Amino acid sequence: MLDITFYKKQNNDNFVPCIIELCDEDYEKIIVSNFAKRFHSEKQCLIVEEEEYSIDAVYCDALVLEEAKEICNRLLFEELEKVQNYCSKIEGETINKSKLNFMFVLRDVLSSLGECQYFSYV
């Protein structure tokens, strides 16, 4: 199960969460792309998370977004050592192959977002 939480910003700077739950059979690019287009048009906040592992994308610039895509691609091509070294600096733990389904979805989301201004592992 993958939860994608989209936070809509209100006038008083509060955020209201809208959660989309994706089962394994829903890991299709068109579903993720449709969600990403909605996020992109709102230009607010995207949080993608699975269990304790989460990634925030809030106002990313193109350079950092490209780096995020590269991390996903490295996982998908099983260049795990480079990814583990990078991610251990950020979250103090390595990423294993059980996260690959998550990364497939994440890659499609990132590919559909276009430019944003901020990206970070949490």
Indicate residue ranges for each PLM-predicted region.
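Acidic (Asp/Glu-rich) sequence patches and key acidic residues
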Residues: 1-122
